[in-house]
Amino acid sequence: MDLEIKIRDEFIKLGQLLKLADLVQDGVEAKYVITDGLVKVNGEVDDRRGRKVYEGDIVSYDGKEIKVIR
């Protein structure tokens, strides 16, 4: 696991998670990498920027894995 990101709430949106993990610079970049199918959630490509990511989910992008913790 490359990164663990701690969230306060029950979930975080996929685009926000990528920004919080410093894997993208802004929401526009997050939108493009997600809609281009470059991001996986729990091993499956997800092209929804508003996808809710919960504790225990694993997000993969650009050779890095992020685990969401609370």
For the regions a language model picked out, list residue spans one by one.
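A basic, amphipathic helix-loop patch mediating RNA/tRNA/ribosome contacts
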Residues: 13-55
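A detector for short, charged/polar N-terminal pre-domain segments
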Residues: 1-12
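A positively charged, amphipathic N-terminal helix/segment that binds anionic biomolecules
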Residues: 3-4, 58-70
